[in-house]
Amino acid sequence: ERVVKAAADTVKRKIARIVLLGDPDEIAAKNPDVDLTGVEIINPVKSPKLQEYADLLYELRKAKGMTPEQALETAKESTYFGTLMLKAGDVDGLVSGACHSTANTLRPGLQIIKMPKGVPLVSSFFLMIAPEGGNQYCKDGAFIFSDCGLEPNPDADKLAYIAVAAAKSAKTLADLDPR
């Protein structure tokens, strides 16, 4: 429910184009008070692009032993379908994790998008913007939190890498100047 409300609010504010994955009738029935105008809802199982995405997944994973039948079944899963949409260039980003475990969120990304060369580990971050614009800890009100939960026992080098990666992401995505 909170994901659907957030999607509707994002579209209403004209922040982004949103695509929800799931059964449109089920999503509407579970969220009768949410105006889904402008929110695209795609059912992976019934999508005309399912076979195209399954073929893409098969090509990427056949060396690991995946069969075309396994690729088709796997592509029906929302985390894989969304990641395949991203790989195919049909969407610009993917938000997952509210309804899926970290492992089930990351696995498709690592298998389909893959790690760039020279990137030694997966890390994450989030931004928090203080409502009044600032406080005693941060004059502009923007906070960057790096989540080391993906790397349970990082050494000093890994911690430094995580901090630099979060700072670069904040600069790229939000035009912040981390310090």
Language-model segment annotations:
Residues 1-179:
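Anion-binding alpha/beta catalytic cores of soluble intermediary-metabolism enzymes, centered on
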